[in-house]
């Protein structure tokens, strides 16, 4: 592969679509805390002055949707009408129904191992050894930029920052290896009374420089900080937000394929979410084992059927053993049936709200980021 550029973006927790994702996952967590076997498909819409929570939920739990919504928005930092959105005064509307019994009969089984997939679909997982967390560098550093924006906003270091922000970063590659950062874009909502010059200097010193490795920065690296010159109106006042609208930000920043299914608001019986996590787990363990430098896994399911309809391993010519052998190892060491992967990754816990901002992958404390199968895979592959 010759020289090329690759770009990924991220958005902060205060971006309207991410507010929606976090509310949906906060509702899911509250329900799973009381009822781990609940069926949850929770969708959220946010716009100036209002939040609408809808979907299909079947559970024995009772949760206060309004209070969960307000607390989530409060935690993000929208606590005053000056910001264009206020957790304390926004309207919260609920339109929740129950999961269709036609779906239930395909998912629930007397034998848990025969639990069927909650829907048909295809999911991808990916890993690469270009970063220490085995994630693509562009999306990893795009996330870290907006995470840093949140840190300095919440700590009071830059008190004029507001919750809505976006980042974008372009990396230079030569023969598949990173050689530098070509361009950095960071746009952040801000208070009315901060000058463009002061904002740009502070963002460079307090957000960009602490995050980006100096070895990838050079004299030709370009910076675009609030390039429109003004970003006072943001959050739900600037744009409406909807659950599931940031699926590339949530995954690999465009460097891997995507099956199209969103994650937030869905309990683990929905393979859109749980099988995508399992596919990441498989790919990461293959790369951690040194069996490939890059690995993409595809799995697919039929509604009501436990066994995956397909498993595909793609290693882009970086494999150390054949992809046929890798596929056999995946089938041997990973149970990718819905119940099997839920047990394998211990998914029936309220861990999802935190996934809903700054990426579902590459943060080591999530169970699908473990590399506990790497040594077994390496041994089974016959590599020393």
Curated annotation (Swiss-Prot):
Region (Flexible loop): 99-109
Gene Ontology terms: cellular component: cytoplasm
Annotated positions binding ATP: 15, 164-166, 230-231, 239, 245-246, 262, 266
Binding positions for K(+) per the UniProt entry: 43
Any one Gene Ontology BP term: one-carbon metabolic process
Cofactor: how and how many bound: Binds 2 divalent ions per subunit.
Cofactor(s) listed: Mg(2+); K(+)
Top-rank taxon: Bacteria
Keyword Transmembrane helix appears in the UniProt entry: no
EC number of this enzyme: 2.5.1.6
Residue positions binding L-methionine: 56, 99, 239, 270
A GO molecular-function descriptor: magnesium ion binding
Gene3D superfamilies: 3.30.300.10
Catalytic reaction(s) noted: L-methionine + ATP + H2O = S-adenosyl-L-methionine + phosphate + diphosphate
Keywords, sorted A to Z: ATP-binding, Cytoplasm, Magnesium, Metal-binding, Nucleotide-binding, One-carbon metabolism, Potassium, Transferase
UniProt binding sites for Mg(2+): 17
Quaternary structure and interacting proteins, as annotated: Homotetramer; dimer of dimers.
Function: Catalyzes the formation of S-adenosylmethionine (AdoMet) from methionine and ATP. The overall synthetic reaction is composed of two sequential steps, AdoMet formation and the subsequent tripolyphosphate hydrolysis which occurs prior to release of AdoMet from the enzyme.
Protein name (record): S-adenosylmethionine synthase
Annotated organism of origin: Erwinia tasmaniensis (strain DSM 17950 / CFBP 7177 / CIP 109463 / NCPPB 4357 / Et1/99)
Taxonomy of the source species: Bacteria, Pseudomonadati, Pseudomonadota, Gammaproteobacteria, Enterobacterales
Gene: metK
